[in-house]
A protein has these predicted regions:
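Residue-level recognition of the N-termini of beta-strands and the immediately preceding loop/turn
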Residues: 27-28, 59-60, 178
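Acidic, His/Gly-enriched loop-helix segments that form or flank divalent-metal centers
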Residues: 23, 92-201, 205-210, 217-233
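Active-site flanking residues adjacent to catalytic metal/cofactor-binding acidic residues
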Residues: 4, 32-33, 63-64, 144, ...
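Active-site environment of divalent metal-dependent phosphoester hydrolases
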Residues: 7-11, 37-40, 66-71, 150-151, ...
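Hydrophobic N-terminal alpha-helices or hydrophobic patches in metabolic proteins across all domains
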Residues: 18, 231-236
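Short, glycine/charged-enriched secondary-structure capping and boundary segments
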Residues: 15-19, 44-47, 75-78, 157-158, ...
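N-terminal active-site segment of His-dependent metallophosphoesterases
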Residues: 1-48
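Active-site neighborhood of divalent metal-dependent phosphoester bond hydrolases
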Residues: 38-133, 171
Length: 239
């Protein structure tokens, strides 16, 4: 079962997992990153995957560029007194929604205080976020958040491409021996996913009026996709 770019949409994700009868003991869940930002309930999403992996070691959670930005913003807030570059970059990508899911009183102005607090209050979660892998190789597919450089082997990629890449990956017709599942670049028109010869993009842009996708690959290797519009309780409203 594969999901990506949940962006704080916890209740939407939960609804889809229930609809496909996700069984954490028997099924393998692979999340392709971007669990945070934009939607309202990042805290619940992160904690869900953190606890899932703590209890069952066979589930896979990858680093998305939004987790990457969060990690860099926290590091900057803690270790440099003057620098704001990383925090600004993160807040331009709706980092405030994530901070507020942990600390509702957080604002752009007092964010440094709350980034520091997060590192103290949620040590285990922070360590987990820092150590998320950037890729995974399954029996039949490769998995990344954003993309790859096809001129290099799957295990010879650089961090930035795996987590941030759009082009030339998206236009490329080159392929590996296995198809790649990825998210990162929202598919904002029907069917809200994109299946190509070399890759499958499952970011349905649920926080942009699209849909959240959940992909089920059964034992025979058949692919089914369930979808949901974002539920109201996941929509972030500016306070």
């Amino acid at each position: 079962i594969i999901i990506s770019d949940i962006h704080g949409s916890f209740y939407t994700m939960k609804k889809l997992l229930d609809e496909v009868n996700f069984n954490p003991e028997l099924d393998k869940l692979i999340c392709l990153g971007d669990m945070c930002d934009r939607g309202k309930n990042t805290k619940f999403v992160w904690e869900y995957f953190y606890n899932l992996q703590k209890k069952y070691s066979h589930h896979i959670v990858l680093l998305g560029n939004h987790e990457d930005m969060f990690n860099l913003a926290i590091k900057e807030a803690r270790y440099t007194e003057q620098e704001e570059v990383r925090q600004d970059h993160y807040f331009r990508n709706s980092g405030l929604t994530t901070l507020q899911s942990f600390y509702p009183e957080a604002t752009k102005e007092n964010r440094r205080k709350y980034f520091k607090l997060f590192a103290q209050d949620f040590k285990a979660l922070r360590t987990w976020l820092k150590n998320l892998p950037t890729r995974y190789e399954g029996k039949d597919y490769y998995f990344v958040h954003a993309g790859v450089d096809f001129s290099k082997g799957f295990w010879n990629q650089i961090h930035r491409d795996l987590v941030w890449m759009r082009e030339p990956y998206l236009s490329s017709t080159e392929k590996y021996n296995k198809k790649i599942f990825h998210g990162h670049t929202p598919v904002l028109k029907e069917p809200y996913y994109d299946i190509r010869d070399n890759r499958i993009n499952i970011d349905g842009g649920c926080v942009y009026g699209g849909k959240l996708n959940i992909v089920i690959i059964n034992d025979e290797g058949e692919i089914n996709i369930k979808q949901s519009k974002i539920l109201e309780e996941d929509i972030y409203e500016d306070k």
